[in-house]
Amino acid sequence: MIHHISAVTLAVRAMPEAITFYTQLGFTLVCGSPQARFSTLQAGDALVNLTLAPNFKPAWWGRTIFRVDNVETLYNAAVAQGLTPCAIQHGSWGERYFHLTDPNGHELSFAQLLPQAAQRQG
């Protein structure tokens, strides 16, 4: 039985820039370095692996969604770090969320489950 995704691995053109971006969002570097070809960052139970691919050009679209406790707190922290997320949206499926694109074109979404949706899932 599958329980959950343990990590997402993303190609990056420049490791220092990518590590800076993810640490600005609250991730902690747990393996690797700005000079490494592969690094891992963690926030809660979520792991993001970065693999160096200097000539990387996204040829497809995808989105990684992170569940957060408070979407407004993270949104405000991202803005305070100089990042430019889209405005917080209210999804009809019971989440508040915002999207943000990393320096390599990967779309990230940060979503907070609203109480009524949490009751349906619980």
Regions found by a protein language model. Name each.
Residues 48-51, 99, 108-111:
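Conserved beta-strand in the GNAT
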Residues 41-45, 100-103, 113:
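Active-site beta-strand termini and strand-to-loop segments that position acidic
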Residues 15, 64-107:
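Vicinal oxygen chelate
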Residues 2, 9-48:
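Core segments of cupin and vicinal oxygen chelate
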Residues 35-37, 58-60, 92-96:
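Short acidic/glycine-enriched loop/turn segments that link adjacent beta-strands
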Residues 1-16, 64, 112-122:
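N-terminal beta-strand motif that seeds the catalytic metal site of vicinal oxygen chelate
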